[in-house]
């Protein structure tokens, strides 16, 4: 049975991560210790009651791919929907795209609980967060507007497409390439042997 270490996480946020200083940054004024405690308590409840119970069942009845259809472990789809609807996917994402705009310090503590409760389930949110981060860092305004709200809302998810047959996960040996097309899309050439949360 998973029990989230809320007091320990709050201690780390206050004493080590400097949450009180972060709350002085413009835009984060409402993200002090009181807000962090309330958010962490709710995250603990969600992870203990919804995410952790799927850990064992996910190992027993794992996801599959058959006839071109991907099936997740029982309960994962519903749990991810609840995660998105509860605002957990957008916790540290900008409000302009549907996120809550909280500091990453709070987001990281909540993610720590999800990872500890069920690593397999957490990968979907982690990879979706990575896709959002990549778009925020390097995406055009058009791409951000098109993709980020759907990722935050749980309509779409991110994946990791790294492992290639000739390279494993050695990026220097990966041969997959993307060629721009005239309509603004890209055509991919290459192979992948594992796609995390594909």
Where are these regions (language model features)?
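Amphipathic, small/basic residue-rich leader segments at the start of a protein or domain
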Residues: 1-123, 142, 146
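A glycine-rich phosphate-binding loop feature that marks nucleotide/adenosyl-phosphate handling sites
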Residues: 64, 128-131, 153, 164-166
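Short, mixed-charge aromatic SLiMs
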Residues: 66-75, 137, 154-159
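N-terminal glycine-rich flavin-associated loop
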Residues: 123-141, 168
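Short, well-ordered loop/turn and helix-capping segments at boundaries between secondary-structure elements
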Residues: 18-19, 116, 133-141, 153, ...
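Glycine-rich, Trp-frequent "lid" loop and neighboring beta-strands that shape
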Residues: 92, 100, 142-198
């Amino acid at each position: 049975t998973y029990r989230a270490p809320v007091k320990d996480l709050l201690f780390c946020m206050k004493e080590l991560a400097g949450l009180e200083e972060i709350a002085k940054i413009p835009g984060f004024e409402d993200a002090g210790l009181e807000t962090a405690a309330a958010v962490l308590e709710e995250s603990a409840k969600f992870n203990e009651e919804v995410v952790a119970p799927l850990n064992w069942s996910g190992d027993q009845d794992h996801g599959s791919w058959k006839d071109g259809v991907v099936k997740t472990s029982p309960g994962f789809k519903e749990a991810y929907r609840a995660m998105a609807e509860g605002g957990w996917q957008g916790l540290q994402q900008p409000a302009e795209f549907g996120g809550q705009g909280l500091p990453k310090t709070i987001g990281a503590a909540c993610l720590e609980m999800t990872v500890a409760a069920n690593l397999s389930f957490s990968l979907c949110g982690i990879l979706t967060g990575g896709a959002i981060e990549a778009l925020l860092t390097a995406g055009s305004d058009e791409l951000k507007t098109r993709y980020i709200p759907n990722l935050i809302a749980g309509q779409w998810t991110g994946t990791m497409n790294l492992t290639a047959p000739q390279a494993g996960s050695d990026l220097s040996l990966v041969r997959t390439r993307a060629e721009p097309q005239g309509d603004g899309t890209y055509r991919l050439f290459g192979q992948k042997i594992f796609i995390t949360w594909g």
